[in-house]
Amino acid sequence: MALKNFNPITPSLRELVQVDKTSLWKGRPLKSLTKGISKTGGRNNQGKITSWHRGGGHKKLYRIIDFKRNKIDVSAIVERIEYDPNRTAFIALIKYEDGEYSYILAPQKLSVGDRVISSQDADIKIGNCLPLKCIPIGTTLHNVEMKVGKGGQIARSAGTSVDLVGKDSGYAQIKLRSGEFRLVPLDCKATIGSISNPDQKNINLGKAGRNRWLGWRPHVRGVAMNPVDHPHGGGEGKTSGGRHPVTPWGFPTKGKKTRKNKRTSKFIVKKRK
């Protein structure tokens, strides 16, 4: 996929950079693999904001993605590659030999007409899904499970992947894009290849309105608020906040470690950079 630049005939086109999607499917998604998705506006079940700066956005249909790849030893052919508004990666519609359809995350270099399979005996080929114990060291992977049978959780975003760097004592050691080395059970599944749409990191929305279409509202700085709203608020004239950066609730921000899950720390061999 290439990037598209535009002639600056309007101010918002001057900086706009988009991913070229001309090779993707131009029709509607498969109806049996979609469902409605309601907007939350960043609110929880009590109506309180738990995710700031969310709201609005274009109406979407949710595409049901197969992260588990549980259809074992049944070959499938790639029918088409599609855009998915719910994620940065592209998705692939596959048709199994028994006639069943499914959506999977599309890896880079997967093309229409390619065959994919989920099997212990599968070839080490783009789009094939295998247990980690059956994959040679040095292979690039995506959609990696953390618990057996739970479905892929690691490396699902556009352009991401992990590297299998070792196996020992029932665990595989994988290297994440963050620099973290992590242990994953050898019976967990992973899919060969890197996720599609690696140019996602190079796009430029060009105007605030495009962020609104995506469901993002304006991000107001704390120093622009009143003292009642934020610890950085208030002051005569423009101020710098007068203290080290904090959240609206007074906790240090911009770099302070907040990870609490010590239960799984034993699976982290080396922390991220």
Curated annotation (Swiss-Prot):
Annotated region (Disordered), positions in chain: 228-273
GO cellular component: large ribosomal subunit
PROSITE patterns, sorted: RIBOSOMAL_L2
InterPro entries cross-referenced by the UniProt entry: NA-bd_OB-fold (IPR012340), Rib_uL2_dom2 (IPR014722), Ribosomal_uL2 (IPR002171), Ribosomal_uL2_bac/org-type (IPR005880), Ribosomal_uL2_C (IPR022669), Ribosomal_uL2_CS (IPR022671), Ribosomal_uL2_dom3 (IPR014726), Ribosomal_uL2_RNA-bd_dom (IPR022666)
Swiss-Prot/TrEMBL keywords: Ribonucleoprotein, Ribosomal protein, RNA-binding, rRNA-binding
GO biological process, alphabetically ordered: translation
A GO molecular-function annotation: structural constituent of ribosome
Superkingdom to which the source organism belongs: Bacteria
Pfam families associated with the record: Ribosomal_L2, Ribosomal_L2_C
Compositional bias of kind Basic residues: 254-273
Disulphide bridges: none
Family in the record: Belongs to the universal ribosomal protein uL2 family.
Role played: One of the primary rRNA binding proteins. Required for association of the 30S and 50S subunits to form the 70S ribosome, for tRNA binding and peptide bond formation. It has been suggested to have peptidyltransferase activity; this is somewhat controversial. Makes several contacts with the 16S rRNA in the 70S ribosome.
Subunit structure, interactors included: Part of the 50S ribosomal subunit. Forms a bridge to the 30S subunit in the 70S ribosome.
Name of the protein described by the UniProt record: Large ribosomal subunit protein uL2
Organism of derivation: Rickettsia peacockii (strain Rustic)
UniProt gene name: rplB
